[in-house]
């Protein structure tokens, strides 16, 4: 077994991968709130980190991030549709755009299901997106995002 250089920049960088600051949706608007615990950011890892990353990818506008560290095509095109009149075709396009974003994520093995619902009783959100995926570690992860 090769020795590990715990002080190397590569080790420190890779140690932080798949660890994220926990975010949760604000039910009253289309924003997300950072979560805190004991006066500091709440950090999630593993499958919670993947669920968090999926939410971030879906909620980020396509090509919104200008930082070269990120892929220039990061984000989801659903935001082009949120002002369109509600219809079944718009729901199918939202599902298509979300599926494309999830298929690009390295930690996702299979996109099992995307369901887009019409949030008729919610004035803050027009649509709900439910996702069900299988991670590269063969764990099934589900979650949802409101648009």
Model-inferred region functions:
Residues 105-111:
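Acidic-histidine catalytic/liganding microenvironments
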Residues 1-93, 100, 112, 117-147:
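Immediate N-terminus of the mature polypeptide
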């Amino acid at each position: 077994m090769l020795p590990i250089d715990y002080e190397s920049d590569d080790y420190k960088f890779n140690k932080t991968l798949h660890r994220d600051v926990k975010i949760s949706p604000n039910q009253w608007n289309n924003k997300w709130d950072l979560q805190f615990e004991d006066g500091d950011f709440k950090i999630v890892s593993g499958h919670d980190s993947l669920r968090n990353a999926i939410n971030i990818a879906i909620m980020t506008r396509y090509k919104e991030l200008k930082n070269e560290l990120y892929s220039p095509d990061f984000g989801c095109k659903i935001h082009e549709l949120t002002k369109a009149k509600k219809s079944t075709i718009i729901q199918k396009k939202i599902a298509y755009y979300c599926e494309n974003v999830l298929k690009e994520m390295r930690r996702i093995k299979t996109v099992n299901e995307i369901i887009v619902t019409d949030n008729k009783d919610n004035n803050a959100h027009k649509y709900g997106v439910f996702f069900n995926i299988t991670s590269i570690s063969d764990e099934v992860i589900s979650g949802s995002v409101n648009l």
